């Protein structure tokens, strides 16, 4: 059955999931730095949720399901944060990479762009 709106369609496609603690897997030689740098960027998950929340305060399409989908995305960002923190704890992350990621996060927070643009760019470039 076809969903009433594209927003409802996207929301219906989402799967329920719960973050769980993990143990460190074995990484290929040379992959440790890549994984640690990626895990350090977990500090951007909550800001992405905040960008979405900020966007919900402004003009949104008056289409059924839009706000509900965005609200569910904020919850997803919180779950991503928990899951990535579990992975970071399991693998460990260099303080140097944490510092680099904090600088990147600060730069994004200070960027004077629409919150949806910031959320979309981060989701597409960092988390996918």
Predicted region positions:
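Non-heme di-metal
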Residues: 1-128
């Amino acid at each position: 059955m076809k969903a009433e709106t594209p927003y409802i369609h996207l929301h219906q496609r989402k799967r329920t999931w719960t973050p769980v603690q993990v143990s460190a897997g074995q990484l290929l030689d040379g992959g440790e730095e890549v994984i640690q740098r990626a895990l350090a960027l977990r500090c951007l998950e909550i800001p992405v949720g905040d960008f979405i929340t900020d966007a919900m305060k402004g003009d949104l399409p008056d289409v059924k399901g839009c706000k509900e989908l965005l609200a569910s995305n904020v919850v997803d960002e919180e779950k991503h944060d928990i899951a990535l923190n579990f992975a970071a704890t399991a693998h460990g992350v260099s303080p140097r990479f944490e510092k680099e990621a904090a600088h990147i996060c600060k730069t994004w927070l200070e960027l004077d762009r629409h919150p949806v643009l910031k959320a979309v760019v981060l989701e597409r470039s960092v988390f996918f």
